Amino acid sequence: MKNSVFKSVLVSALLATAAACSAPATDSADAGETTEAVAATGYYADLGGEATGPVYRKAKADTLAVSGYDVVSYFTGEGVPAEGSEEFTIRYEGYDYRFASEDNAKAFIEDPAKYAPAYGGYCAWAIGANDALAPGDPQVYEIVDGKLYLNFNEDVQGRWQADIPGFIEKADVNYPTHNADEHYQD
């Protein structure tokens, strides 16, 4: 009970801070004219933390996780992944997650570990079968026991589906051996 009350207070505080940062500010020198918002986006929160393993992104210097897809959208509605909006960006463990709606951003704030993809969004089969980092495609996914798993392509997904429990077991051992700053290289 205390934990859920704390989370509710935390979410409210983050939303209030984000709203205050994105609201137009008045400058007394401009006699009430509005100035640019402090925050670059309309909704932003930094949940802090450091990645415990590598997170897939298109370029090593990029911080956008899951190619900008809304990770909560996999679990809601039709279960179809939706592209997130820059307006609803949450930084989690050093990476930026985007959301299609404020409700989805709030859900992520409540429990980011529930929605963040397994193995940092890297291909679940590659990590399980070969202890290798390969890109995960946000359109090729499966939710197993409440966790989101991405795979490289549909062919690889088929191989992964042949022994999901076995590949997850191996990947759970292999993934932590990779450094958080590792990145897939072509």
Model-derived features with residue positions:
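N-terminal low-complexity, Pro/Thr/Ser-rich intrinsically disordered segments
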Residues: 30-72
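Bacterial N-terminal signal peptides that target proteins for export
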Residues: 1-10
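C-terminal partner/receptor-binding element of secreted or periplasmic proteins
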Residues: 161-186
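C-terminal motif of bacterial Sec signal peptides marking the signal peptidase cleavage site
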Residues: 17-20
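Mid-length scaffold segments of soluble, non-membrane domains
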Residues: 86-124
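N-terminal secretory/targeting leader peptides
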Residues: 79-80, 87-88, 130, 139-140, ...
